């Protein structure tokens, strides 16, 4: 009787009150902007946030490179946070304007009206207990204050979208955005060409062939060699971190988020012929047959319009499956990941600081420009020592994360847990698509021997002792 009432409701009142097109429209906005389906939005938001922090540093003349908590001394206000998102929309609009023959971007315009970036208190954002998202504070990384992306839910979409759902989206967004931000900040280090390669050329004749000219070239090249050796550990660690974050991001976005969304959208529209797979999986003839079996779509019958309660229940299952596959329910993974992202921020700040110090030392040695209020030689020594320490912490954090991934893979949790009862439920009920097996990520990371974690019985050197600490 209840099923008949819901079917009758979905075929009459719901057709006018909550059409499927509006449901898919709002869910697409959440997919593109909260789940970072649009990479350009994430890049623009990260860039604008970093520019805001840099401008506040310049205003306060406070580059507390030796104090990680120094960032907290720069307090960003609510209006400035809103301005960051406004400039992000402007950057998105400018990017769209460069494509003359492109039609109006309706999802972007809808997101402009509904999406907000707000400051939140630590206790005000508590993800839904029903999906058990961990409380790791990824929202603290974008700016100097905890901020989250949220959205106004217009009526009648609030019939199936609840504030708890939006809190879950905000937590997932902060998680994905923080990983993307760390990866972007590390790759930007390679744009500092003088740090990567600096081989001074001899001056032109006749000075270049003189004894003084040759001595100057020797001095410059010796200085460049010393700096290159000082940066060698930093570049090796940064390269490994870029590889780890890049593969993790590709796994989370390309397999988990994309695959889960396609499965949910197919259920909404009633499509049964398509199977959600990543682009890499489509080109791989030897894809895991068990993974393919888990992705076999369920047959749907009858109408493909759903009543609000069915939509709400299915959407909560979708979010729960997404959070579990993203490992957001595993504090054993999210806590060391947050620590890694903090150390990467510290390492990037140190690299920029040492670059600034070396520029000042070059001016002092080559042009005679002396800053009487600064001791750059002492600062250089301090920063170089800290870079070695932080690089070791980054390496240790990555090794701990890989170990955590191996432990999660051994547990085999989340593959069927929590969704087995749905298979035996009503016909046509949404069953989350099985995506995101951790062993697929581990296979990619295994190509980097740098990530191998030694077992205790294998012995080890000083690095293993650091890990135990």
Model-identified regions with their sequence ranges:
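Long alpha-helical rod scaffolds of large eukaryotic non-enzymatic complex subunits
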Residues: 1-469
């Amino acid at each position: 009787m209840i099923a008949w009432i819901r079917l009758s409701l979905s075929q009459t009142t719901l057709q006018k009150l909550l059409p499927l097109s509006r449901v898919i429209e709002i869910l697409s906005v959440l997919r593109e902007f909260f789940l970072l389906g649009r990479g350009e939005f994430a890049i623009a938001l990260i860039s604008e946030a970093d520019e805001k922090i840099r401008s506040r540093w310049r205003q306060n003349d406070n580059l507390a490179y030796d104090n990680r908590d120094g960032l907290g001394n720069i307090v960003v206000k609510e209006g400035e946070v809103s301005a960051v998102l406004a400039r992000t929309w402007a950057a998105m609009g400018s990017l769209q304007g460069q494509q003359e023959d492109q039609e109006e971007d309706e999802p972007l315009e809808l997101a402009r009206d509904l999406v907000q970036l707000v400051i939140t208190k630590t206790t005000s954002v508590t993800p839904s207990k029903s999906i058990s998202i961990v409380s790791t504070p990824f929202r603290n990384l974008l700016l100097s204050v905890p901020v989250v992306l949220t959205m106004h839910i217009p009526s009648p979409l609030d019939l199936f979208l609840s504030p708890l759902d939006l809190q879950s989206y905000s937590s997932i967004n902060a998680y994905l955005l923080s990983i993307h931000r760390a990866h972007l900040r590390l790759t930007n280090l390679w744009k500092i060409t003088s740090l990567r390669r600096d081989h001074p050329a001899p001056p032109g004749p006749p000075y270049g062939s003189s004894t003084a000219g040759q001595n100057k070239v020797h001095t410059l090249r010796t200085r460049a060699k010393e700096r290159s050796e000082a940066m060698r550990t930093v570049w090796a660690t940064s390269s490994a971190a870029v590889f780890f974050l890049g593969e993790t991001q590709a796994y989370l976005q390309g397999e988990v988020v994309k695959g889960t969304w396609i499965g949910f959208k197919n259920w909404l529209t009633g499509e049964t012929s398509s199977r959600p797979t990543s682009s890499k999986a489509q080109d791989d003839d030897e894809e895991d047959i068990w993974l393919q079996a888990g992705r076999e779509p369920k047959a749907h019958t009858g109408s493909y319009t759903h009543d609000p309660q069915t939509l709400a229940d299915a959407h909560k299952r979708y979010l729960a499956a997404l959070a579990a596959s993203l490992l957001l329910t595993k504090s054993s993974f999210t806590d060391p990941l947050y620590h890694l992202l903090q150390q990467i921020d510290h390492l990037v700040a140190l690299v920029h600081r040492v670059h600034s110090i070396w520029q000042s030392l070059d001016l002092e040695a080559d042009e005679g420009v002396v800053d009487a209020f600064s001791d750059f030689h002492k600062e250089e020594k301090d920063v170089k020592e800290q870079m070695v320490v932080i690089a070791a912490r980054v390496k240790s954090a990555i090794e701990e994360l890989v170990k955590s991934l191996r432990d999660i893979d051994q547990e085999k949790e989340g593959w069927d847990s929590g969704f087995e009862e749905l298979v035996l439920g009503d016909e046509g009920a949404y069953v989350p698509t099985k995506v995101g097996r951790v062993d697929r990520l581990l296979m990619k990371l295994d190509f980097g021997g740098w990530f191998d974690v030694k077992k205790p019985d294998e012995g080890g050197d000083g690095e293993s002792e650091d890990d135990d600490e």
